[in-house]
């Protein structure tokens, strides 16, 4: 049984979260911008995962089951992977990879969560790798899940899945919904970090 299937099949108790009445809010999407070098190099190593045709944007319909499944995947990855910098792990400043050996930094958590949700049938177009500045002002990567009830953030620094407006982060850029190799600026144009994170 695939890890994603096993995790989603497990028990999980969670609050209703977004199912309390609230108007969805979406981050402002700007012009195309440069993809992070970590993503570019990831696509050289995992070419088959990055060769894709442009597609129409798709949002997840966030049913109670979908919400619970998302929480399960987020919690399982956060609890299963031990944090380690790329320099400690690979001897380089920036490398995006799947944390198959149980260690990784923020981008690696994101890649695994994205893969597990896609394996469970979630649309790629709604699972967007996102670069932010965290509460300390450091570069950081999270997974944005775009739904009909707003955009939610899966984050290795935060155990809860939060709406993007409640993270306290400044959103810099992310994958476009139509093509994961096209990245778009978010909010007001600002200088993006050269690397994503050392954590």
Predicted regions and their residues:
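N-terminal signal peptide c-region/cleavage motif recognized by signal peptidases
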Residues: 4-6
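A structural boundary/capping signal
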Residues: 8-199
